[in-house]
């Protein structure tokens, strides 16, 4: 009688964290592998960076012309005056998340023109 993958997963789910760590160490020793090598191996990070299609626009500082920055934030986000002021006052803060590169760069240029410091991540 063989054990199914689901039975193995259920058994691991019932283990404590220390038991799982001991299991991993035993598997590393038995099979001659390390868990860290599997995480580090490959070009996954370079591949993920090349495929980035969504960007976050982060307001890092309002600068000297805070009123103009608040106006620019209102125009870009559609927020009310109070919400836009709160967002600018709480910098660094995310203005927009998950936007395409063109929109992120346009928003960055608009806010920098108003005097703000902006990052696109």
UniProtKB/Swiss-Prot annotation:
Ribosomal protein is among the record's keywords: yes
UniProt xrefs under Pfam families: Ribosomal_L12 (PF00542), Ribosomal_L12_N (PF16320)
Gene3D superfamilies: 3.30.1390.10, Single helix bin
InterPro entries reported for this sequence: Ribosomal_bL12 (IPR000206), Ribosomal_bL12_C (IPR013823), Ribosomal_bL12_C/ClpS-like (IPR014719), Ribosomal_bL12_oligo (IPR008932), Ribosomal_bL12_oligo_N_sf (IPR036235)
Quaternary assembly: Homodimer. Part of the ribosomal stalk of the 50S ribosomal subunit. Forms a multimeric L10(L12)X complex, where L10 forms an elongated spine to which 2 to 4 L12 dimers bind in a sequential fashion. Binds GTP-bound translation factors.
Family listed: Belongs to the bacterial ribosomal protein bL12 family.
Name of this protein: Large ribosomal subunit protein bL12
Organism: Vibrio atlanticus (strain LGP32) (Vibrio splendidus (strain Mel32))
